[in-house]
């Protein structure tokens, strides 16, 4: 674990894409590992990048050898909820076009990302992976810094009975006056939403 962006970039540059082409995978094992095998610091930014070219077992994909669910018995939606409750944000990187070849995969990964406040990010070439990772980390850290600064005052006003829309409007105006900007990961949307 590190908070050094150059170290993250250097490590990512050593990775390469290989394998693939087979059906549903043990996605729940990766999610469970992020929850139980990592020693998360209490007040740190907690981001998990789940890179996938196939869906998990048990979501109704054709040819799934474990159609009733993951062989480890874990429920991926429950794991996503547990991540959210622990403050872990899940960014799912969809290796394309492989992932879109499945009927339910992109909807599934979009859903578990959303549960945790993360995003589903399409990735058409592995060469862009380092940019996706660094962009995700910078966006999350930037937003958390802003939340730490304004969150307590906003929470106090809302819990004190102030109108949420009015508080949001005032905060927006203050941030505009300060010329406050946040970093935001942007990417071309290649998935069609139903």
Feature-to-residue mapping (PLM):
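Divalent cation-coordinating acidic motifs and surrounding scaffolds
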Residues: 1-194
């Amino acid at each position: 674990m590190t908070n050094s962006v150059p170290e993250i970039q250097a490590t990512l540059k050593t990775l390469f894409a290989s394998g693939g082409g087979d059906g549903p995978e043990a996605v729940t094992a990766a999610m469970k590992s992020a929850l139980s095998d990592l020693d998360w610091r209490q007040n740190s930014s907690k981001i998990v990048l789940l890179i996938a070219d196939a869906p998990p077992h048990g979501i109704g994909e054709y040819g799934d050898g474990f159609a009733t669910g993951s062989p480890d018995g874990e429920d991926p939606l429950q794991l996503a909820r547990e991540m959210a409750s622990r403050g872990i944000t899940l960014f799912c990187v969809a290796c394309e076009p492989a992932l879109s070849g499945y009927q339910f995969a992109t909807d599934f990964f979009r859903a578990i990302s959303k549960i945790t406040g993360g995003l589903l990010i399409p990735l058409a070439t592995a060469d862009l992976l380092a940019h996706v990772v660094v962009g995700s980390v910078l966006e999350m850290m930037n937003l958390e810094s802003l939340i730490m600064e304004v969150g307590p005052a906003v929470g106090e006003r809302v819990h004190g009975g102030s109108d949420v829309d009015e508080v949001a409007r005032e905060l927006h105006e203050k941030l505009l006056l300060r010329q406050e900007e946040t970093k935001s990961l942007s990417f071309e949307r290649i998935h069609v939403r139903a």
